[in-house]
């Protein structure tokens, strides 16, 4: 066997007849498969053992030789070689065809390669190949032309007239002769001459022909090889025949197709031997041609050949195509051993890096490891007895299993795996039962819940795989989300609620104003019931041992609550004491206002002394009473602080991660989780009907709205307003009423209302849910998406009327249907994104580019889409950043901007920063470390070998399911119906003409005139320096310019989305890149999804990496061809070096589907879409796949060239010295 890891590249080409014969182990002469009595393969048939090898290991057909000792012997009786049966997976046969046949891919594909090289139309070709017309091969001394078609009648007439002075024939034979006469060199020369003068369609045709001719010339393929003389027969194990239970046989469709070919071929041979009349022979040849067509690509021409039940048979092409084809089913995704799946349940007592594995599953997964250990410990004598012990579940087995799984991580995966956090590593702990236990905090990353979700377990076997799982994939390592660099393991639901409840403050709660001298006293007081969790107390600051407190503060008292003392115990030691949910408190220190000296003033002392109870106290009691009195006064001046909501908990995690990195963060997360569960249980927060309080003055609000609506209806009836205006006003009246109800409800709600607490903390629900429960449901849309003007006035608490209930069903059904459609759409988008960017890998440290990207805050009009600091964090600067006023250097050139630097830049009032960006990176086949910047998933600089393309694709695709599906048509004014959500993202990435397209100016100048041609149709005239242009605005479009405005090239004249292809024509590439980036961010930010700019940059760069050659100059490039920017630059550099004229080009934008198919790698393109077209093209060009991307390597079974699979990480050797061990790189 060849070692896949030794491959440099993979080449595809046309096979010559000799090549096909050299692959073959013998000719298949009979259509028989197996003998019906003996069930053994027939000799010379499709399963013949003599050709393809024995069906049983080390055993010949007749049974003369059995056993390994005869390895390699060829039996003298049956002629079968004694070898392993698996050679039947690789040995091929062949069929010698009695007449040449054309290969349907090259004749029928679009464009027809055969037609282009012969300069014949596909229709003419079809007539010749299928024996409808004759073609003139050699005109001789006649007035006929070469390649002229003749009907049967004409042919006879010419034969009578000219005799044998000309040559004409039909069928693939004739085409073969024509192909054989082509001189590629001459053809190239004449086509290049033609290009110099040709225009229009002739030029296009010449370019296409030149491309095909050049392909043949450069690849060394001969055009004659498109016609088959010999047909290869694939190995029998790849088209198996298996016996079913009932004694019948199931067989692959290919066997049927091969049988038809052999039958027709044998019949043709017999007819030729008999010297049958030409009309019979021609018919048989046509049938043979059709049989071979069906075998190669059934259904490509004419009606497909069908099997039983009118099902079209699956041909060789179908074996490769589609989701069930060879590429996607077997090469890009295989089923693996050492795996299992089960239902998941919550494991609240697990550590962050652990999962619970059911015992019976673990014993099966780790069987070989346990067997080895049993033998090594002497508990079993050999592997066989060890296996028996395991099957009987002997007691020794469990102890051994415990030891085996210790330190052996397993991978857990949940489908759908939308991003890389969908598969993570855990250390298994054995649990009873049959369900996998999952840590609650990793649920967000997996998008898992415990309503019956299942997960798969995989065991990494080799030491390297285990090391990678532990170091790179352990759940405790994956704290940040790769899409935005924010923590993905934020607590949710119960944990949020518990911590919210714990950090609540209440005025005059039990024991308010108590003074404590240490956290232990606080806990004792809480346990004995003297104080409540929400009680405001004072504690001696020094007793908290917080290093952020100053010496002076340590001698003072800290105003806080019992709950906050408990909460702060989970934070790392050197962290500030968090007393209020503010960034200042979190990132710097506890605010000064919470530290107090409890020295009493005269006035308060007098008040106390007038109280007889105070005077009866002893000295210590008096001091305490004085302090409590002072404390109460302080509490009056310090307002009640908000509790910690979900977002703030997320900020705490991010800050801990920033300061202490992974280990400390995961420990803190576990403590936060435990606290949350414990106190949400203590809180006992539940929902009852009594918690939903209906608004008393709801009736009045609705009556006012109804009155407004009645007025509008009256105006409409009198003809004062149009139908559209009436509808809009009705809708806005009811919307306003609902908003008013919502606002009043929120005001009237008590802060202790359980439903309010759930929604306020961020655990579950929001204001709108509450409005529907207690206020009114509001307006609903009908199935067409138009809003019904009859609102649902009832709330769920009051109950809906029958009509209201019916109206509600539209929305509910639409919601479910949309969700189902959205999931599929979003998955397909992710697949296309992954495909286009799968070869973008960080390849080098610095590409040395001299360009950068100047960015400011992303704005849409006056609305902020993304702030500057968010955009620059984790990027390298292109220029040194200097404070505009003080002149002090904030960050040197090429420095990495972190959170603190970004803050300094904002505070300095700098509005634009020039950064390194993927847009301007010069690295071939990827990006460099400097242009990419920080890896958002780790918060460190990105490593060489990181597959940033795939991470980008997942980051954009994964939130796709959260985007809305279609536009809601509110009716009314045009221009509201611009596409949003998922369809808009697809529109951008596929570079389609957008819906609601805006008009852009192609020249710079002044708007000289705006005239209305007809109602709703306007024409804009722009007066430039050289020319004047007129633009028609789409019907009813809103204009963005007025007369007298100055416009620039590429400026928008009407509202709507710009067509990027048009923008690219009038502006440069960087404008288009920035426009696409902004548009994508706009869609995601509107849905509240944050994605790092760099991910979108990587994708957009892939869309704009090709150029179209306009003039070839003196280079070998073909005009009109698509090339990678790097290839174009290289070709031009070579031409200039030799003193020749360089070529010219223009940039093109390709949609992601098109860009994937235009990739250099044919394996990657073929496994994506349009398999046959890609392979046809690649074969003619004799393409080499350099195996640079990930897909190509997965397909041929190599390690992917990313991460630890990269060459530079694989060539490492460790040399052991006597004294010390030093790692030496063998690069």
UniProtKB/Swiss-Prot annotation:
Keywords: DNA-directed RNA polymerase, Magnesium, Metal-binding, Nucleotidyltransferase, Transcription, Transferase, Zinc. The keyword Transferase applies. GO terms for cellular component: DNA-directed RNA polymerase complex. Zn(2+) 2 binds at residues 847, 921, 928, 931. InterPro entries: DNA-dir_RpoC_beta_prime, DNA-dir_RpoC_beta_prime_bact, RNA_pol_asu, RNA_pol_N, RNA_pol_Rpb1_1, RNA_pol_Rpb1_3, RNA_pol_Rpb1_3_sf, RNA_pol_Rpb1_4. The keyword Repeat does not apply. SMART domains: RPOLA_N (SM00663). Belongs to the RNA polymerase beta' chain family. DNA-dependent RNA polymerase catalyzes the transcription of DNA into RNA using the four ribonucleoside triphosphates as substrates. The RNAP catalytic core consists of 2 alpha, 1 beta, 1 beta' and 1 omega subunit. When a sigma factor is associated with the core the holoenzyme is formed, which can initiate transcription. This is DNA-directed RNA polymerase subunit beta'. It comes from Lysinibacillus sphaericus (strain C3-41). The gene is rpoC.
